Curated annotation (Swiss-Prot):
Belongs to the UPF0441 family. InterPro entries: Biofilm_formation_YgiB (IPR009576). Coiled coil: none annotated. Pfam families: DUF1190 (PF06693). It comes from the Bacteria. It comes from Yersinia pestis. This is UPF0441 protein YPO0661/y3517/YP_2976. NCBIfam families: PRK11653.1. Residues 198-227 are annotated as: Disordered. Residues 212-227 have a biased composition (Low complexity).
Length: 227
């Protein structure tokens, strides 16, 4: 009888510990569920210029202009740089390149307002013209990022909107709205060194491959969870 009593006491202690831990486990699960529900994406619109944005959003004309000018300034700092015009044209096509400003305060105009006919100067760098910009719809302060496109037939960025890191945002069509990670609107590092011909195209191809893999992985996870 004494042995049976000890066994019952041990069983009771295990049950009591399980009861005490249950609320803790539920609380931890709730924290992870809430973290998973936090918004990690941002709805953005893609435009070629401030006029396109203003026409689509008449009441936000000032915000459109601010976002456009911010993107132009970012383009100067973050666009890929080339040692020669030929290297830039090889990646982005004719009429898609301009000399990078020598002074930080200088901002190039968009591809619709600038030609690539400027003579090359000693020590200058070349960069693609900003072809459009991404504007966060719900974020204040004109949050935006410059977008580039290529007209070179063999470029993976041909006809696409890509950012300074080479990430692909689909067809270079103005007025599109899409959902992107919030990191897409985060500032990119300044580019002060030139890259070799074809280097940016390789970045675009690599980023596109990573995006496809991530999309496939997301679909697989959703199916496995019964989504």
């Amino acid at each position: 009888m004494k042995r049976t009593k000890n066994i019952n006491q041990e069983t009771f202690r295990k049950s009591w510990r399980s009861y005490r831990l249950a609320p803790v486990a539920l609380a931890v699960s709730a924290v992870f569920m809430l973290a998973g529900c936090e918004k990690t994406d941002e709805t953005v619109s893609l435009y070629q210029n401030a006029d396109d944005c203003s026409q689509a959003n008449p009441s936000q004309s000032a915000e459109c202009t601010t976002a456009y000018n911010t993107a132009l300034q970012e383009a100067v700092k973050t666009a890929p740089k080339y040692a020669t015009r030929e290297d830039c044209v090889a990646e982005f096509g004719e009429s898609q390149c301009t000399q990078a400003p020598a002074q930080a305060g200088m901002v190039p105009t968009s591809s619709s307002e600038t030609t690539a006919a400027a003579p090359q100067q000693s020590g200058s760098m070349w960069m693609p013209l900003m072809a459009g910009y991404m504007m966060g719809r719900m974020m204040g302060g004109g949050a935006s990022q410059p977008l580039f496109t290529s007209k070179a037939p063999n470029s993976p960025a041909n006809g696409k909107f890509v950012d300074a890191s080479g990430k692909n945002f689909g067809a270079a069509t103005t007025g599109r709205t899409m959902t992107v990670p919030k990191t897409a609107l985060a500032p990119k590092p300044a580019v002060t060194k030139t890259i070799t011909r074809g280097g940016f195209g390789e970045s675009v191809a690599k980023q596109s491959s990573m995006q496809r893999s991530a999309a496939t992985s997301s679909k697989t996870t959703t199916r496995s969870m019964g989504g």
